[in-house]
C-alpha cells in the first residue's frame, strides 16, 4: 500500500453521500432518478453528492465516451455505435438520453433495443462498430440502472 496516499475518511451520518469509485470494470451502475427529483442542480452533482444517476447523466456519459473515442482516433464521425438495454427503463427516458449522447457526439447510434448483454457485444463485432453500450444494472434491484461499455 502506498503510504503517500491519504487515509480514507468515513462519511458521517450528517454529511452528504459521496461515492468513492465512479466506474467499475466495464461501466457504471447504481440508483437512478429524475434530476428534478434530486436535490442537485446538475447530473454530475447528483452522482457525486447523492450517488444517483439521472437521464441527463446517461446522455453526458455516452457523449463523453464517444468524444474520447473520436479524440483518440478510435472512431471517426458517423461511425457506428451499438446500443441496447434490458427492460427495466419502462419510460424509455434513460435509454433515449443515452442515444442522444451518441448522436450529439456525431456518431451513428445503432439501436438494437432489448437484448442480452452478450448479444449486444457480439453484434458490435459483427457490424464493426466503434463501441457498444448496454444499459443494464445486471442483477441489481429494479430502481437501479447502469451503462456498460464494450
Where are these regions (language model features)?
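An N-terminal, well-structured beta->alpha segment
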Residues: 1-98, 104-105
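Ferredoxin-reductase
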Residues: 70-150
Amino acid at each position: 500500500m502506498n503510504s503517500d496516499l491519504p487515509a480514507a475518511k468515513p462519511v458521517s451520518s450528517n454529511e452528504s453521500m459521496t461515492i468513492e469509485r465512479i466506474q467499475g470494470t466495464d461501466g457504471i451502475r447504481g440508483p437512478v432518478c429524475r434530476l428534478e427529483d434530486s436535490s442537485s442542480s446538475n447530473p454530475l452533482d447528483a452522482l457525486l453528492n447523492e450517488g444517483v444517476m439521472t437521464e441527463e447523466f446517461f446522455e453526458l456519459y455516452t457523449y463523453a465516451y464517444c468524444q474520447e473515442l473520436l479524440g483518440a482516433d478510435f472512431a471517426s464521425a458517423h461511425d457506428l455505435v451499438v446500443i441496447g438495454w434490458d427492460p427495466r427503463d419502462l419510460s424509455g427516458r434513460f435509454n433515449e438520453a443515452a442515444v442522444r449522447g451518441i448522436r450529439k457526439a456525431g456518431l451513428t447510434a445503432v439501436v438494437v433495443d432489448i437484448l442480452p448483454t452478450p448479444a449486444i457485444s457480439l453484434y458490435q463485432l459483427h457490424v464493426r462498430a466503434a463501441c457498444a453500450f448496454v444499459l443494464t444494472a445486471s442483477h441489481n434491484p429494479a430502481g437501479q440502472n447502469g451503462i456498460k461499455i464494450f
